[in-house]
Amino acid sequence: MSDVDPQGPFAETDTRPVHDTTPVVPHDVADPWHEFEGWGLVAAQNDIVETPFRRFRRRFVRRRAALVALAFIILIVLVAIFAPLVAPYDPLEQDLRNTLQGPSGSHWLGTDELGRDVLSRMIFGARVSLLAAVQAVGIALVLGVPPGLIAGYFGGWVDTGVSRINDTVMSFPPLLLAIAIVGVFGPNLRNAMLAVGIIFAPRFLRLMRASVMAVKEETFIEASRSIGTPTGRILRTRVLPNATSPMVVQISLSLGFAMLAEASLSFLGLGVQPPEASWGAMVGRAYRFLDQSPTLVLFPGLAIVLAVLAFNVLGDGLRDSVGREVRGA
């Protein structure tokens, strides 16, 4: 037996206790990835996962026109909420000695045919117009989204039947259909917005149906079916959240068109009834005095144009920013 150390002169000295039998791992054959563990930790900390909401926010803030439109809409909402605090006069207070007056220091936007302050009536009219638009769009969502969800997911004869009914409703001229509905139920704001909601419902139905038909082919929907998830739960927690992105855009656009529809029906005397004020009703009553006081039509008409434009610009910004990126777990 040779006394020569087989590991040669470069062997490491084993200074462990005699009872320690753990094998010695030389430094030159230690874990080569140990020194990179810190790098991976730093990379994980610096790698910020961009959620769908963060991605949407990043895209939306780049669209200046949409931000301006959103700020204008928020301003209108705040004015409508705090109308009693903002309005300088009671919107129903009459002053028959100062009728059809132009803008002045005491009445910034003038007075109407009964001497009522136009600015105060516009401020309170903003509340009525906004609430009317929200009511109409809410009715459209309730009437349009559930049938579109069911038709798009199940297809077959269900889809065919729902689509035929939807096409029949869309075949009627919108204004004539609204006039007919208001004529049956009576001329007031609630019935007018019911009519507008019925008119808008087919658009929401078609959009939801198309979105659901695209979503139901995704792999996570197939996975939910394969593990036996109930259909109702799939529709509620998987399909609906992933099909609502286009609806956000449609809601914004429809709010603007609903305000315009309310103004049109009120102009015809089928919406807001005197003495309540809305922008459309103010234009309808002021039209008779166009030659005596042009500003009486100008200011509420301009408010309608700007509000509808703001909702449309906001809808365009949302359309460019939002994406169908929600997923079911």
Language-model regions, residue ranges each:
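Short hydrophobic alpha-helical segments within the ABC transporter permease transmembrane module
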Residues: 118-125, 130, 165, 172, ...
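Helix-loop junctions at the membrane-solvent interface of multi-pass transporters
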Residues: 82-86, 153-154, 180, 184-185, ...
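Membrane-embedded alpha-helical bundles that form the substrate/pore pathway
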Residues: 63-66, 128, 160, 167-174, ...
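Gly/Trp-centered helix-boundary motif
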Residues: 1-145, 149-150, 157, 175, ...
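Hydrophobic aliphatic residues
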Residues: 76, 82, 100, 104, ...
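Short alpha-helical transmembrane interface motifs in multi-pass membrane proteins
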Residues: 38-39, 128-132, 147, 159-163, ...
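Generic hydrophobic transmembrane alpha-helix motif, especially the helices
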Residues: 108, 112, 118, 139-143, ...
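Glycine-rich helix-loop "coupling/hinge" segments at transmembrane-helix boundaries
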Residues: 170, 181-185, 196, 211-212, ...
